[in-house]
Regions:
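Nucleotide and nucleotide-moiety/phosphate-recognizing core
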Residues: 1-138, 144-158, 167-191, 272, ...
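Acidic phosphotransfer microenvironment of two-component signaling modules
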Residues: 29, 201, 260
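The catalytic Nudix box helix
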Residues: 31, 198, 241
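Short, conserved phosphate/pyrophosphate- and ester-handling motifs at nucleotide-, phospho-/glycolipid
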Residues: 143, 199
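An accessory alpha-helical subdomain
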Residues: 160-162
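Conserved anion/nucleotide-ligand pocket segment
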Residues: 195
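Ubiquitin-like/PB1-type beta-grasp interaction modules and other compact soluble beta-rich domains
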Residues: 204-284
Length: 285
């Protein structure tokens, strides 16, 4: 099953007062973190839908940006544009907003997993988390074949995400159902992934929390300079993990997260429980 990521960045952020996509997050931005989490969940491509003439913070080269020509119609308009852009390249898209500062890759994987079920996965149109009794349509997975359905809803001025579910086959996952997944239960037992920030006070409270605790190790010649470890550190990005062991993430250093080589992307987001390894690019470790 080909799965993509779709980030809706074009909201007006009226309650926040400033665009959420560009809000600072531990040396990065909320939008950059969201795109990185989707990449780490194995989604490709990752597409960002923005409003007309909206300026976005810097993003990796492999993140695609799609312009929504119509502003002010809410998330369904952005979904219609994004699902259409993905329809020929992915069967399913995890659709989310930019205001999920604690989104974890394991939540994304959990929501996508039912589509791969050999018996009834093909029949599903939507997998919808229902956290603490509230549906989460902007942290959900949708068949890209729903693009014309969503576009028709927008054309009919039926702009609430709930209208998608009226004629779709929807699997709703409440807290207990989500946490039957052992990996998600270990990584995010309280489902912080589904906490969003709508107002400035929400953002300030989220930003005041400590960065995730990760394990950092150095190998080869870097171990002699920074200590082999492993050592615990608070770091929200690979760059912050490097600084925690007094390393400069330059062309001489390579990073791997949980065994997957990531190169030198200092803004790649980290999540609680990650292990970050640094090795010398010159000596291969």
């Amino acid at each position: 099953m080909r799965a993509a990521g779709l980030v809706l960045a074009g909201g007006r952020s009226s309650r926040m007062g400033v665009p959420k996509a560009a809000l600072e997050w531990h040396g990065s931005t909320l939008l950059r973190r969201t795109c990185g989490v989707l990449h780490r969940a194995g989604l490709h491509p990752v597409v960002v839908v923005r409003a007309p003439e909206q300026e976005l913070p810097p993003l990796p080269a492999d993140v695609e940006v799609v312009d929504d020509p119509r502003e002010g119609l809410g998330p369904l308009q952005g979904m219609a544009v994004g699902l259409t852009a993905l329809a020929d390249r992915a069967e399913v898209a995890f659709v989310c907003s930019t205001d999920l500062p604690f989104l974890h890759a394991e939540l994304v994987r959990r929501v996508l997993r039912p589509f791969g079920h050999p018996v009834d996965g093909d029949a599903l149109d939507v997998v919808l988390p229902v956290a603490r009794g509230y549906p989460q349509p902007l942290s959900a997975a949708y068949r890209t074949r729903l693009a014309p359905v969503v576009a028709a809803l927008v054309a009919a001025d039926r702009l609430r995400p709930a209208f998608i579910f009226e004629d779709a086959t929807v699997l709703r996952l409440d807290d207990d159902a989500l946490l039957t997944d052992a990996a998600l239960r270990a990584a995010d037992p309280t489902l912080e992934s589904l906490v969003n920030v709508n107002e400035r006070a929400d953002y300030d409270a989220a930003r005041a929390r400590p960065a995730p605790e990760v394990t950092v190790e150095c190998f080869g010649v870097l171990a002699s300079r920074s200590g082999r470890g492993p050592r615990a550190a608070r770091a929200a990005t690979v760059g912050a993990a490097a600084r925690a062991v007094d390393l400069v993430l330059d062309r001489h250093v390579l990073a791997a997260v949980n065994g997957d080589q990531t190169g030198r992307d200092g803004e790649l987001p980290l999540m609680a429980g990650d292990t970050v390894a640094f090795l010398s690019a010159d000596a291969g470790g």
